[in-house]
Amino acid sequence: MLCIRRSLSRFVDSCPRPRYDTGCTYCEIPKFPADKQIDFDRNLNGTQPETWKHLLILSHGYPSMEAMPPRIELTPATLSSEINAVKRQMLSPMHPVAVSNVVVNNHTLPNKPLGPQEHFVYLYPDRKSIRFEAKDLATFIARYLVPEEKPEVYNPFKQEVEKTQRIQQSSIEFEEQDITDELVLICGHGSRDVRCGVMGPLLQREFDQVLTQENMSSHVKTGQITHVGGHAYAGNVVYFPRKGESVWYGRVFPEDVQGIVDTTIKQGVIIRDKYRGYVNGA
């Protein structure tokens, strides 16, 4: 199992206080039901799911996160359900792949409109946007979501079969582009859990306000993401920088947004008491 750990030298202990009020920086957070309270007790370090790659689906067909079903991976005819059906056979348990559906503001669109049987995804840490036809899903998985196997004991028959498969796969062209924007995604999957349904829109609005104020909105995009684990730590924020691994934060509130922008997005420094990843020595 892959485990990405970060050096303590790249951390600050806590989130800096905001420097100004956008109008909702100090907005009161609505009260949650008794059985849906935010967990303020657990140390967030190590609560991030370990992933080798993170696939973000943009072509899910839902206009907003509010319209997203609670378990889209079980919804027929969605890319999530198609991957879910074959993941045990095709994906490596030692190289886990997270699959999420996202609604992103002002993201880079394909050069031409998607057809009814086409998919459009972002893939990290590859930082690629990829467009492909539904019929080529198996090849897409083999090419992008499975690690290259190490050489095995010589077997002429097996090598010939694998050679044929490689030729077949290599003949399929995927429309692929580099992702140049940075991306901030907030879990807003309200049909799955009310905490994220409340916190997601609040946080996205605050990020949009702060990024505009800081003249960063042209290259840092925001959006909402389906369940990423840890609803009890809402608001959950995942930041995908231009370089390096993604940064996962929990228990983020509107008053924390300026600190995240100033500290993590501008300086590349991680806020330890919000960080859901793994820390050396922690």
From Swiss-Prot:
Signal peptide extent: none
UniProt-listed Pfam families: Suc_Fer-like
InterPro entries hit by this protein: Aim32/Apd1-like, Thioredoxin-like_sf
Record-stated family: Belongs to the AIM32 family.
PANTHER family: ACTIN PATCHES DISTAL PROTEIN 1 (PTHR31902), ALTERED INHERITANCE OF MITOCHONDRIA PROTEIN 32 (PTHR31902:SF7)
Organism: Meyerozyma guilliermondii (strain ATCC 6260 / CBS 566 / DSM 6381 / JCM 1539 / NBRC 10279 / NRRL Y-324) (Yeast)
Name assigned to this protein: Altered inheritance of mitochondria protein 32
